[in-house]
Amino acid sequence: MEKIIVRGGQKLNGTVKVEGAKNAVLPVIAASLLASEEKSVICDVPTLSDVYTINEVLRHLGADVHFENNEVTVNASYALQTEAPFEYVRKMRASVLVMGPLLARTGHARVALPGGCAIGSRPIDQHLKGFEAMGAEIKVGNGFIEAEVKGRLQGAKIYLDFPSVGATENLIMAAALAEGTTTLENVAKEPEIVDLANYINGMGGKIRGAGTGTIKIEGVEKLHGVKHHIIPDRIEAGTFMVAAAITEGNVLVKGAVPEHLTSLIAKMEEMGVTIKDEGEGLRVIGPKELKPIDIKTMPHPGFPTDMQSQMMALLLRASGTSMITETVFENRFMHAEEFRRMNGDIKIEGRSVIINGPVQLQGAEVAATDLRAGAALILAGLVAEGHTRVTELKHLDRGYVDFHQKLAALGADIERVNDESASEQENKEVVSDLNA
């Protein structure tokens, strides 16, 4: 089993480049199934396990997919299979995003009920409600969701009960080839939604209003391949911004888009962090003393739930009492217990956590409970006394490329090792930590 070992106490300095956005590239690759003519070339694709998984799904469905040099080439002009089995979908719940394109392109989709990360129930009822409104017949049973329509999907007016990102993406893709106009209301406004709409419009689609609460899609008869550049990953950018702040560092986060990070920038500045827009990215300078704040996660443009655990690590360094309220997902405080193992003063009260700081974090062996928690525990390790050993790295690898190497390049004392190949010196250091 692999683990990351962090020896705390180093200030981070330098420049780090942000990868293409994981949460943008997965729906864009899925949307490539809509193109019945020509191949698509998707650029700035991060080399993440989730990307390899969605590529496997498309190959299984009959598309020709190549991935090299951060470019994914997809040719989906062939006859497509319409079933995505559990062996693929269990690895990543975003696999359900092939449902909209398959239904629009072929009139049929059979997709295993999704797996993926363990953050609450994350139901897909909003996806199915939308498909039904467009004329599809839905059956759920034996571990599968099956959707079928005779002829083309029909344009419809659809109101989402919650601005679900996945439902918004799936319904945009389904509506792109539907007959007539589809109006989606109370939709997600994330930058990744805008990126998907731009991609489909480049393929010949007619989508207006992405990034607002209402999106109108005028269906077309066919779409073609196109070359597209993925937007930078705002969550990776935010994670490195927190890394700079927590270590009293000075880091240029190259590729960070200020307009995608408005709420995070506001909250970090409220804590006393200096953030400067330098055109090519954001420079983040951490203060000697951080101020306590309250955060409530909300759908975009509110504070992103995917930055909640990283900010919890930062708030442990703030002088006073802070509160984080999680409104997007239930059961997303599992990392709080891991922070407690590192001497964090955290109390969970329903959907909120109370954080008392500042505390001197202590190195410990901790487990990543989900993707963002893994990054947050490493951030805590950057300022912990002694050694922090983070396990369950499979979660981290779903969302970050070379995370430990990028931190090391900024000055962190960090390495990734196999338990079996851990050096004798590292084992001695671990014993020293435990005896301290």
UniProtKB/Swiss-Prot annotation:
The modification 2-(S-cysteinyl)pyruvic acid O-phosphothioketal is found at residue 117. InterPro entries: Enolpyruvate_Tfrase_dom, Enolpyruvate_Tfrase_sf, MurA_subfamily, RNA3'P_cycl/enolpyr_Trfase_a/b, UDP_GlcNAc_COvinyl_MurA. Pathway: Cell wall biogenesis; peptidoglycan biosynthesis. SUPFAM superfamilies: EPT/RTPC-like. Keywords: Cell cycle, Cell division, Cell shape, Cell wall biogenesis/degradation, Cytoplasm, Peptidoglycan synthesis, Pyruvate, Transferase. The active site is at 117 (proton donor). Disulfide bonds: none annotated. It is found in: Cytoplasm. It catalyses: phosphoenolpyruvate + UDP-N-acetyl-alpha-D-glucosamine = UDP-N-acetyl-3-O-(1-carboxyvinyl)-alpha-D-glucosamine + phosphate. One of its GO terms (cellular component) is cytoplasm. Its EC number is 2.5.1.7. This is UDP-N-acetylglucosamine 1-carboxyvinyltransferase 1. HAMAP family: MurA (MF_00111). Pfam families: EPSP_synthase (PF00275). Transmembrane segments: none annotated.
